[in-house]
Amino acid sequence: MARKLIYGMVCLCVSSWTHAGGIMLYEVGSDNTGLVNAGAAARAQGPSTIASNPAGMSYLEGTQISAGAQLLFGNVSFDQDSSTTSNGGNGDNGLGLTPGASFFISHQLDERWSVGFGSYGDFGLAESFGNSWTGRYYVQDASIVGLSLVPSVAYRFNDQWSLGVGLKAMYGILKSQTAINRAPFGLLDRSDGQYKYEDGTWGYGANLGAIYSPQVGTRIGLAYTSKVDLDFEDRLDVKGTGQLLNSLDGLNTKIGTSVPQTATLSLYQQLDPQWALLATVNWQDWSSFGEISLQVDTNAAGAQSTTVNANFKDTYQLALGAQYQATQKLLWNVGVAYDTSAVSDANRSLVMPVGATWRLGTGATYALDKSTLLNLGWDVVWMGDLPVDQTKSLSGQRTSGQFSNAWIQTLTGNLTWRF
């Protein structure tokens, strides 16, 4: 029997993915990491603008190629409280070291037209809490990653107006491994069962953008990314014998994940030859996200699989940043940002422990020579305490506590060649 759900474990962002108030990633390109997304849709300072606003290619001369690498690490550890009735410990730190990469190329055809291509990850989550923690009946190991391939084109009407569009093909990979309680209410001495789910699929969307420059040194950018639907399908691979699990093994399950639409408004303002100020307001449509996970619950009479609605709400970001041209070769970036939470404390899940975040970032771009730039960036994402309280409907098992002092850091580096 086929079952459909919108399943998205995303943002402890990984594999060049990181954690936002929702679960989209801003750490695409090292300069954007150091600025924590400030001015992203208006800067147009390198080919990574393909990800933030394709219209920015109109401001790039000649051919430019950028290759980058990211490393994400952090602390997302659970502390159960006295209300927990499920056995097990607090589990491992859910977030380990996670590498990632990106690639961009832009080419100016003439004074009007520019084309480019980007390959990057801007959506994802990976978490691993181990096989013996108290929340293992909700999640043990889970990941969903989205790799975007984006051919793009930009057209410059005049000195003030530029438009750009990118066609996005996103390949998503979903993996999930979760324990099943084979001894509900502790009536029997049985080890846990387990189910696995894994699939990969393509989804399609578009990036649109415009940049308006009323005067030299001032740019206002507006960018929109469409929703991308990822439809996964696999048969549950259930381990463990017994009547409770036989009905679930091989169950064909369809999972439809929606990567939400977003809108970004940015400002880049050059103050003098050394200083520039940047700002961004961003909206993400998480209220249309739908269901968050597939769960298996058991009691003495049998087993059932159910879906859980995420009860998400839209998120907003405000980011402010500055750039300082210290020397002809060295440009410093700094930024601070706040993201609202996609979920209330009452609706937060163990599968996706997201919340409101503060970001602080810095970085620098150094000109190795006239045609080669080295960029390094760092940011920290502070989530604080994330309380969770979930109860299984059949067994009544309760897992209560919080992810304490949760934080994530990202280190990025990239080289840009200009021809």
Predicted feature locations:
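Transmembrane beta-strand segments of Gram-negative outer membrane beta-barrel proteins
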Residues: 23-39, 58-77
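Repetitive helical segments and hydrophobic/amphipathic motifs
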Residues: 12-13, 62
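Sec-dependent signal peptide recognition
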Residues: 2-8
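Outer-membrane beta-barrel porins/channels
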Residues: 21-36, 40, 83-88, 97-419
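N-terminal signal peptide c-region/cleavage motif recognized by signal peptidases
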Residues: 15-18
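Outer-membrane beta-barrel pore proteins
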Residues: 40-45, 50-63, 105-112
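Mid-chain, structured segments of secreted extracytoplasmic proteins
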Residues: 69-97
